[in-house]
Amino acid sequence: MNATTANTWNRYYRPILQLGVPIAIGQLGVIIMGFADTMMVGRFSTDALAAASFVNAVFNLFVYMMLGYSYGLTPLISSLVGQGRRAEAGGTLKYGLICNLVFALLLMLILGVGYCFIDRMGQPAEILPLVRPYYLTIGASLLFVALFNALRQFTDGISETSTGMWVILVGNVLNIAGNFVLIYGVGPFPRLGLLGAGVSTLTARIIMAVIMVALLLGRKRYAAYRQGFCQSAVRTASLLYINRQSFPISLQMGMESGAFTVSGIMAGWLGAVDLATYQVMITLGGLGFLLYYSFGSGITIRVAHFYGQNDWSSVRSTTRAGVFILLGMAAISSMIFYFGGEFIIHGFTSDPAVISLSLTLILPMILYQLGDSMQICFANALRGTSHVMAMMWVAFVSYVVVNIPVGYLLAFPCGLGVVGLYLAFSIGLILAASLFAWNFYKVMRIGCIGKRGNGVTG
């Protein structure tokens, strides 16, 4: 390795990997938790698995919107830290917490209205008694999800990505243990089935939020941030600034997740077996998505760091490094799906019909890995430069205008069923990747020197 190559590795590739690996480990814990939930519920009954699929499809839309909203904090914090403005970063956390909690309450209100119309969403009648209590239990956890998300994006923004990793892993262990005890009924605990999975998830999310609050209040190295947090006044202009950075990302992730949510609802129109199959494969496909987003977060942090220093050459080089890293991740995910997919599917369910249909979806799922990894790469690079409005419009065209209608056409008029839904994902994600890349390089050409805001002051 010559000096130039070593410098490129140390300056661009290594930091993304160092930031992304702890996030990836934490996300791997999320994947394992999703696998455990699906496997335990699937072993309990196919109806319970179908009910979980429907509720998770609905809630994933809102959870990803909340996650996207919190993502608006990361580049703001990272940019301020890159300039040594720690007190202002603490103030930005304060505004971000307020915005994220208010946003969560609004989404919970929407979900509460949606609960009144569950029986009109075309789902199999036999799963509705299982859907209702699970829906309410998961809904109660969203405020704690918002609190955890905001605090985690703060620690990620100051390049302490391992903090969120450890808290997520603790939450996963608690959730898996709670699932086993409450789904099947162990010792004095009742056999709650799907509701037990919901209670376990709610409990784990509360504990995760409490741990993050305790860490940020107790660690000495956060003293400067706490001082800025406490001394900053709550100003409407600051809250609106956070919202302008966060809401477009929320809509982008919401529309992306919405394509999967609507597809999940359409899978329910095909029957309980198709819906259960869709849940199995979405859980399996989450392996790639969450890995890509882990390293995508590393790209955002590094891009925002260089953006705060007005170093556009390093912004470009960091993004190029991210492209190669995520392409490698996509190749690894595809090999896991191709060679290990059948083995993993058998772990989710013993229903022969679900297994048979799931096997037909392995290749369509592999097809969309390239588009998924690249749209995440360039979307996160744009996020790092705080040019977030374009993300919203790209998502609207790719997922709402193209993905969902094409999925319907392939699944129903063309008769491809759930396979058609998956093929549509490939089209939507590749289009999104192309448009995000075009917008990023447009920003690079313009340079935007002197036309940005790097934080919120209190």
Language-model segments: residues:
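Short runs within selected transmembrane alpha-helices of multi-pass transporters and secretion channels
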Residues: 70, 74, 138-157, 164-172, ...
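Short alpha-helical transmembrane segments in multi-pass integral membrane proteins
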Residues: 1-23, 77-143, 189-247, 303-368, ...
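Small-residue-rich hydrophobic transmembrane alpha-helices
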Residues: 49-108, 112, 145-164, 264, ...
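Small-residue hotspots at the loop-to-helix junctions and early N-terminal turns
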Residues: 46-57, 131, 135, 198, ...
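Transmembrane helical elements of multi-pass membrane transporters/channels
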Residues: 18-37, 137, 171, 204-208, ...
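N-terminal transmembrane alpha-helices
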Residues: 8-39, 43-44, 57-72, 76, ...
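Helix-terminus/linker motif at the lipid-water interface of multi-pass membrane proteins
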Residues: 28, 32-50, 118-125, 181-194, ...
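Alpha-helical transmembrane segments of multipass membrane proteins
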Residues: 35-39, 116, 150-154, 177-184, ...
